[in-house]
Amino acid sequence: YCYKFYWLEAIIQLISEGKTESTFDEIIDEMITNAWYSVREFHIHLSGMPLDGQIKDGLERAVLLLTELSELSANASKVEIKNAIKQYNKELKTTKEQLTHMVPYRALAGFFTRSNEKVNWNSANRMTAYIQKFNKEVLTLPYILGTSSKLKKEVYFQQDWIKMIQDHTVNILGWIQYEKVKWLQNNNPEVPGLVYKLTPTEEKVRKLKKVRDLWQDIMEVQEIRDVFTGQPMEGKYDIDHFIPWSFVMNDELWNLMPMDASLNSSKSNRLPKWNPFFQNFAQN
């Protein structure tokens, strides 16, 4: 499932912030905040969608449950999301615990080929002991686990790995994102431009002033009508996308148009109806 990528990403982020130890609870909170925008804004399924319509991915279920419990918007900040998780921690507890069953242990599986000892994946206590033994006798692992249970279980980052991760954080996170995008695109083939839908785009990158200036010059020489109302554009107006930005993920000129400011917010991210709006759009 996709949350293995979010598990690794959360650990790298915590280490880059100077953390030397954490807990399952803290790491999973970080995972929820990292997955929040994609799931909420674009309805991306982290591990595909089965025929029965049930959500397979535990991390996606956690995001959707927090959505039901809170009133947070899709572009809520990490601080806001973590505050909401804390507020509804009791209600989220069972869903969060499900994320601890396999991934924290399986994420280290690649290292265990160095040992001939058989790994018992069915017992958290035995896996914890095996990880500690392997780390001591065979090879230093990125992290080992403490003896507490469930969400309270400690995660101790190893010093040899901390320095390497801090020195190469950007490259490691870039690799994780690359692998994450490949996984998500395979599971969401109907979603275009998925690489641009993992985190909110900074508004300062999307400045539309020059587009507004161009439309203003056009309106000085010919009449432009609002695509949705058919009324001449006069007074206050917004510049917005005919096909919502969340679908095309760009600000190309062909898709930008003046629009009645009072209608812009109500249009939201819904696709406009082909008839009669496309004809109006083309005539402008």
Task: Give names to the regions the model predicted.
Residues Y1, Q216-M219, S246-N250:
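Short, charged/polar micro-motifs that form catalytic or ligand-binding hotspots
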Residues Y1-K207, V211, P276-N284:
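Mixed-charge, low-complexity interaction segments
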Residues Y3-Y6, V221, F228, D251, ...:
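Generic recognition of stable, solvent-exposed alpha-helical segments in well-folded globular domains
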Residues S16-K19, M219, E234, F247, ...:
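Hydrophobic/aromatic-lined pockets within catalytic cores
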Residues K209-D238, D260:
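Short cysteine-rich loop/turn motifs with clustered Cys
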Residues G230-P258, K267-N280:
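Histidine-centered nuclease catalytic patch
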